[in-house]
Amino acid sequence: MKNSRNKQGNLNVVGNKIRYYRELNNLSYQKLSDMLMLYGIDIHKQSIYNIEKGLRTVVDYELCGFAKCFKITVDDLINEFFKELNK
């Protein structure tokens, strides 16, 4: 099955938000990767970079892990996407 890209050519809609919250929390790619591992989610730092750049998809449990690491809700990561859909 071919991966779908959004209008900007990205494979996900949360990469910019993940970068925003990672930087807001002063987390390196490695530190975020280590934090995700504490929740049993094995994402290499290069994969986090690829997610932020829209080069990799994000599965549901990864999205939940990112939200837990940033102490936010999944909705905080995806709400801008839904706002765009409703325009």
Model-based region annotation:
Residues 2-8, 68, 75-87:
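Short, charged recognition helix plus adjacent turn
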Residues 18, 32-33, 48-51, 77:
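Conserved hydrophobic/aromatic packing and binding residues within compact polymer-binding modules
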Residues 37-57, 80:
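Recognition helix of helix-turn-helix/homeodomain-like DNA-binding domains
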Residues 16-38, 65:
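Short basic helix-loop element that most often maps to the first helix and adjoining turn
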Residues 13-16, 26-27, 43, 58-61:
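Residue-level signal for the short linker/turn that defines the boundary of a DNA-recognition helix
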Residues 53-67:
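Short, basic-rich loop-to-helix N-cap that marks the start of a DNA-contacting helix
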Residues 1-25:
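A short, Lys/Arg-rich alpha-helix, primarily the initiator
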